[in-house]
Amino acid sequence: MNLNLKGKVALVTGSTSGIGKAIAMSLAAEGASVIINGRHEDKVKQTIHDIHAVHPDAELRIAVADLGTEEGCHQVREAAPVVDILINNLGIFEPAEFFDIPDAEWFRFFETNIMSGVRLTRHYLKNMINRNEGRIIFIASEAAVMPSQEMAHYSATKTMQLSLSRSLAELTTGTRVTVNTVMPGSTLTEGVETMLNTLYPDEDLSIEEAEQRFMKENRPTSIIQRLIRPEEIADFVTYLSSPKSSAINGSALRIDGGLVRSVF
């Protein structure tokens, strides 16, 4: 299927690893010009190298900035005033006992997980509406609808993304611009693979065996009973970024392997 993304400019925030990197790779494979973002120049350049190793003709641009700050968002807006596709993928998470999370951590999660998307969307969405063309996608989590007690601050920001995305979609009424949210389930990113390698230190388990045990013990409601691969998320996001998805707007879309036991 030709997704008609050749020549489209896509900004993928937090795209030097995990789901963000996979999305950048998938968009590049479809011919989009992709802006790679991260806080560290060496990681951004390594990502570009990795994508070019698979897609030598990919058109890639560098955007080194900390988008968890207003200054970082300003830098990216200045470097790329107009984009056709904005993937608000940047996000931080870490387990923490609710009673031990100080105000500063709540504000840090809010700045990174929410305000990065707010600041960029505030700039790019108006231009998209004026041009009557564009895609904005927020990468949330199944935690948005199934909050985690050990990550209350993270879960709260993911739920907020659903409301934010729907509010912004309302602004696109009558245009060819869409705003949606994708909610991945547990995904085998680099960080999760590292966790699996250390989760059962006293047992000689392969990564595959550790994955199966983790899913059985910690994600028993998953229908597929395995971790989702970043590429599976990325390919769906790429479709959602394309003109082919024009009838999907204001939606919160789960890619969780059936983890959330709900028909809605």
Q: Predicted regions: what is each one?
A:
Residues 9, 16-17:
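Conserved glycine-rich cofactor-binding loop
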Residues 141:
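Residue(s) in the substrate-gating loop at a strand-loop-helix junction
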Residues 121, 157, 165:
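Active-site helix of classical SDR
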Residues 146, 237-238, 249-264:
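Short C-terminal tail/terminal secondary-structure segment
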Residues 97-98, 105-110, 218:
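Substrate-binding pocket helix/loop in short-chain dehydrogenase/reductase
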Residues 173, 178, 248-250:
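Short, small/polar-rich loop/turn modules that mediate ligand/substrate recognition or access, typified
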Residues 126, 170-171, 246:
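Alpha-helical segment proximal to the catalytic Tyr-Lys
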